[in-house]
Swiss-Prot record:
Protein's name in the database: Cyclic di-GMP-binding protein Smlt4090
Keywords: Nucleotide-binding, Virulence
Annotated Gene Ontology cellular component terms: cytosol
Residue numbers binding 3',3'-c-di-GMP 2: K132, R134, D135, D160
Residues annotated as transmembrane: none
Family recorded in the similarity comment: Belongs to the YajQ family.
Domain of life: Bacteria
SUPFAM superfamilies in alphabetical order: YajQ-like (SSF89963)
InterPro entries: DUF520, UPF0234-like_C, UPF0234_N, YajQ-like_sf
Length: 160
């Protein structure tokens, strides 16, 4: 029976490249000259530091542009609250990997509502979709691409 997996993953190598590019842009921008502002990556968390909250918001725009240029969807980021003190402001940005149970149920419900001849089952942080024909799977992919979910979806592990 043909099948494929629906996942939501971020390429960590591209994420590192995007953060490096954003740091290089910070070093060359005139409005950040002489300012201790930087991005740091720690696993699936990006920490950004700047002297003021306003500069953090400017850094968010820089990061979004660099991520988009590297092919990383900004929907996979979860921006935390801005913490400020006298010396600096900082913000944690969490990179979401995998599909949460709640969203996986929404995706499965969307496939059922489309009345396609496919079955879906939740396997941890991914969703397996099976159908009798490859055409049914292609229709399922079209339905999922048209749907609005809170995170970017990728389709992999195609089996015939």
């Amino acid at each position: 029976m043909p099948s494929f997996d629906v996942v939501s993953e971020v390429d960590t190598h591209e994420l590192t490249n995007a953060i490096d590019q954003a740091n290089r842009e910070l070093a060359t921008r005139f409005d950040f000259k002489g300012v201790d502002a930087k991005f740091e990556r720690d696993g699936d968390v990006i920490n950004q530091f700047a002297p003021t909250e306003f500069q953090l918001k400017q850094m968010n725009d820089i990061l979004r542009a660099r991520l988009a240029a590297r092919g990383i969807d900004v929907l996979s980021l979860e921006f935390g609250d801005i913490e400020t003190n006298l010396a600096q402001a900082r913000q944690k940005i969490t990179v979401k990997q995998g599909i949460e149970q709640k969203i996986a149920k929404k995706i499965a419900a969307a496939l059922k509502d489309a009345k396609l001849k496919v079955e879906s089952q939740i396997n941890g942080d991914k969703l397996r979709v099976q159908g009798k024909k490859r055409d049914d799977l292609q229709d399922a992919i079209a339905v999922l691409k048209a749907g609005k979910f809170e995170l970017p979806l990728q389709f992999n592990n195609f089996r015939d």
